[in-house]
């Protein structure tokens, strides 16, 4: 099969809402549709030319979410003939959706596809496993689905404990973690103040008692955070532990979408490519150390693409926890100045199924802002996985 070049021709993301914040009453399907519709409009591609739509999602919040990609596609203007499907690779879902869309193009299933992700953690449901057939005498239990997916399925430990494990194994100190967290907050605040995200963000219409308002600014950022303030926070998951609410990612809401097109179609339709997908890779690691997943995934993508770490001008390595973010930087020899230059999961937030598409959007935008050539997008994945992709500015 002939190798097909795949280009990014349009991106869009919503601003990221904090847990129980501005987006708490916005349906997940609306977030997804908003991002997909904007990405199509920005790409210059006609909606009826989209050959496939793939959306990442982890936490279903409504029965419609089972149809998330299909709802987003049709409500964004794609014809009913456009196929769509959801993917769930947990924290890597948004990036996996982009990879899956690219695979559809690479295999000749279509020439243009959309990959993205959408998550409303604020609307995560509680469910009762005993309700369908009747509970026995005594109390029944409601399971917090949102909190549940943040636990390892084997050890039954919170992902925060896996971060503690990584810190212990790789010699990461509390001071290093808090310093990274503060740097993330400062970078995100500076990016917002400078308006760097304005071209990325599509406003979300939010219905309030006073009418419809537009949500267009990331709201999770804590610009006034300091190392001194973080150092006083108590461990969140383990007595005498290092992981706190201040050096961990947020629980958030948001969506993003990326339009991909095959090189021949880019030329034929006169589209303006933003970046080329150079390669991608996945890896598995010990579930109890899931945060180190980006290390083998990145090493795989370096081997496949023939690139070196020093070739990357921008590195979007999602901050699930400062512990794992520090360990990944240490193990791969990243230049900290190139890593998450505009903030990441700790400061901006981590709407799990959407984050991969959000940081892809950020990485490509930063390449164009700075004139860099290559960007790495990578993230750890609950259950013990890693995913990585490389994009080249064009």
Which residue stretches match the model-derived regions?
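Flexible glycine-/small-residue-enriched beta->alpha junction loops
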Residues: 112-169
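Conserved catalytic cysteine-centered active-site region
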Residues: 57-112, 153-158, 224-250, 331-358, ...
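Phosphate/pyrophosphate-binding loops at sites that engage ATP/ADP/AMP, CoA/4′-phosphopantetheine
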Residues: 38-51, 166-171, 266-270, 299-313, ...
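Active-site pocket-shaping loop/turn-to-helix segments
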Residues: 13-41, 59-62, 85-99, 122, ...
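N-terminal extracellular/periplasmic Venus flytrap/periplasmic-binding protein-like
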Residues: 7, 12-14, 24-29, 33, ...
């Amino acid at each position: 099969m002939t190798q097909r070049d795949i280009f990014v021709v349009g991106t869009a993301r919503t601003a990221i809402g904090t847990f129980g914040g501005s987006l708490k009453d916005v349906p997940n399907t609306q977030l997804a549709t908003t991002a997909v519709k904007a990405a199509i409009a920005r790409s210059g591609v006609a909606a009826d030319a989209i050959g496939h739509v793939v959306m990442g999602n982890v936490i279903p919040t409504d029965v419609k979410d089972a149809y998330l990609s299909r709802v987003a596609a049709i409500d964004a203007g794609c014809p009913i003939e456009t196929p769509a499907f959801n993917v769930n690779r947990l924290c890597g879902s948004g990036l996996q959706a982009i990879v899956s869309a690219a695979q559809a193009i690479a295999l000749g299933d279509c020439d243009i596809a959309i990959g993205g992700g959408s998550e409303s953690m604020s609307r995560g449901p509680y469910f009762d496993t005993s309700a369908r057939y009747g509970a026995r005498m005594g109390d029944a239990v409601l399971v917090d689905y949102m909190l549940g997916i943040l636990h390892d399925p084997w050890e039954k430990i919170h992902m925060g404990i896996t971060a503690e494990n990584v810190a212990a194994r790789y010699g990461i100190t509390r001071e290093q973690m808090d310093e990274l967290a503060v740097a993330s907050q400062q970078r995100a605040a500076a990016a917002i103040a400078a308006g760097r995200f304005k071209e990325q963000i599509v406003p979300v219409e939010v219905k309030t008692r006073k009418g419809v308002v537009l949500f267009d600014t990331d709201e999770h950022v804590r610009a006034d955070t300091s190392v001194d303030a973080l150092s006083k926070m108590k461990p969140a998951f383990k007595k005498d532990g290092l992981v706190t609410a201040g050096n961990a990612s947020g629980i958030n809401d948001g969506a993003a979408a990326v339009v991909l097109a095959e090189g021949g179609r880019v030329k034929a339709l006169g589209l303006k490519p933003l970046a080329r997908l150079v390669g991608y890779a996945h890896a598995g690691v010990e579930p109890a150390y899931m945060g180190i997943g980006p290390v083998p995934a990145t090493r795989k993508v370096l081997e496949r693409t023939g690139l070196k770490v020093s070739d990357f001008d921008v590195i979007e390595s999602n901050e699930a926890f400062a512990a794992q973010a520090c360990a990944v930087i240490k193990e791969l020899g990243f230049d900290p100045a190139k890593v998450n230059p505009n903030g990441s999961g700790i400061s901006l937030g981590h709407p799990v199924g959407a984050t991969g598409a959000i940081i892809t959007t950020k990485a490509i935008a930063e390449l164009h802002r700075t004139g860099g050539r290559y960007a790495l997008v990578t993230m750890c994945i609950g259950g013990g996985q890693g995913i990585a992709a490389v994009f080249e500015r064009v």
